[in-house]
Amino acid sequence: AESTQSVNTIYLDNNKVVGHNTDIKGFELGIKDSKFKATGKKILILGAGGVVPSIICALNKMKVSGITISNRTKDRAESLKIFFKNIKIVDWGEIPEFDMIINATSVGLNKDDQIDLNFSKVGKNKFFYDVIYNPKETSFLKIGKKLGNETENGKLMFIYQAFTAFK
């Protein structure tokens, strides 16, 4: 919880309240269950909100080769560098080379949401991951699939996060 500045599970340990973050393990286990092997890969994260520090921690544990963040509000993305010196920040709309792209924005929660990015030059053999699991297939995932890429929603992350919380 300290590394992410985020707590989503609390419990009593010898009459002391302890905070824990289960999103890190949830994301990590969810990715390990997918076909994507993260070690040595370049990652692009869209968004800089509450779940992103947990995703960065998990990706660092998986020994990815690089993490780039793109957020509509660049200052918010820049603030993540205080805790994560290894990340790069790019402007919203800029899509650098990546192996895996993660939608960690709220775009897609509503069925009619459309992500305002041009993915036409992305190509195939990439992994599109959306932390959103309802709807099951967001517009972001539909774009990834249409371009011939593997896609995965955040359902396994959610399941593993909950499972970890109950341990």
State each model region's role.
Residues 13, 36-42, 123-124:
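Short helix-loop-beta connector
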Residues 29, 133-134, 150-167:
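Active-site capping/gating segments
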Residues 85-152:
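Rossmann-like adenosine-cofactor binding region
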Residues 21, 31, 40-60, 64, ...:
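Glycine-rich adenosine-cofactor-binding loop
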Residues 1-34, 143:
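Phosphate/diphosphate ligand-binding glycine-rich loop within oxidoreductases
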Residues 61-66, 146-150:
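Conserved S-adenosyl-L-methionine
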Residues 62-84:
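NAD(P)-binding Rossmann-fold cofactor-contacting core
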